[in-house]
Regions:
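Extracellular carbohydrate-recognition regions
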Residues: 20-43
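Extracellular beta-strand elements of beta-rich domains used
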Residues: 28, 191, 209-213
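Short carbohydrate-recognition loop motifs
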Residues: 49-71
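Extracellular/luminal beta-rich ligand-recognition
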Residues: 106-151
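Extracellular beta-strand ligand-recognition surfaces/modules
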Residues: 108-113, 149-151, 156-159, 163-203
Length: 216
């Protein structure tokens, strides 16, 4: 009996330790969706439509951008010394084949997850890494946004390899800020999701699930 109790206690300890080394960003519930900050991109004709769904792996967010662009943001502190890795499970059902995503006229992505560090008094001074699910570029491609040098697009997934299927990816945000922005960031200030097609005037459909930070 004593050995069984010790085994149970040890299992609970390991479970708690595992949870302590993860920070979930979104629950993807109707209640959460109603509280998230929605920002329409300046000049866009319409907002991206976001809805909640559920599958065997839990809740997910569906994004439909039809000549539209708006993001969902959450101000949240992330300790990058403790949990430097972002984990994203996502899927693109309808992509944006043929556009030049690294130009102003084609700067649309079927799915994006931004990580944001405040570096000044206004949002325009913030530094961001824009992890994207590209329709045309290759994994690990990166380039500064054609609209602002303070945001860098980094390709984590591409529909050339994974189209209309769930895929989980991981990135070391702390190291990426060092490499891309030359900044040693100890704490993030926010995370945002966006699907946008306002430049290409096309339609994209994507899904997001299980976005969290981890220690490894």
């Amino acid at each position: 009996m004593k050995n069984i109790l010790l085994s149970i206690i040890f299992s609970i300890f390991l479970f708690s330790l595992s949870n302590a080394n993860e920070k979930v960003i979104f629950d993807f519930t109707e209640n959460e969706l109603s509280t998230l900050e929605v920002r329409k991109v300046r000049g866009a004709d319409a907002k991206t439509i976001y809805t909640i769904g559920k599958n065997d792996n839990g809740n997910y967010l569906k994004a439909v951008a039809d000549n539209a662009a708006s993001g969902l943001g959450k101000e949240i502190k992330i300790d990058l010394d403790a949990t430097p890795y972002i984990n994203i499970t996502w899927k693109v059902e309808k992509d944006l084949k043929g556009i030049k995503e690294n130009t102003k006229k084609g700067h649309d992505f079927a799915a994006r997850v931004f990580v944001i560090k405040k570096t000044g008094a206004t949002p325009l001074s913030n530094r961001a890494i824009n992890y994207v699910y590209s329709s045309n570029l290759n994994i690990d491609d990166y380039k500064r946004s054609p609209y602002t040098k303070k945001s860098i697009d980094y390709v984590l997934s591409t529909t050339k390899k994974n189209f209309d299927e769930w895929i989980t990816v991981k990135a070391n945000v702390k190291e990426d800020f060092k490499k891309l922005h030359k900044l040693d960031v100890k704490e993030l200030d926010g995370v945002a999701i966006m699907a946008d097609t306002d430049n290409s005037k096309m339609k994209a459909i994507s899904y997001y699930q299980n976005i969290y930070f981890s220690s490894e």
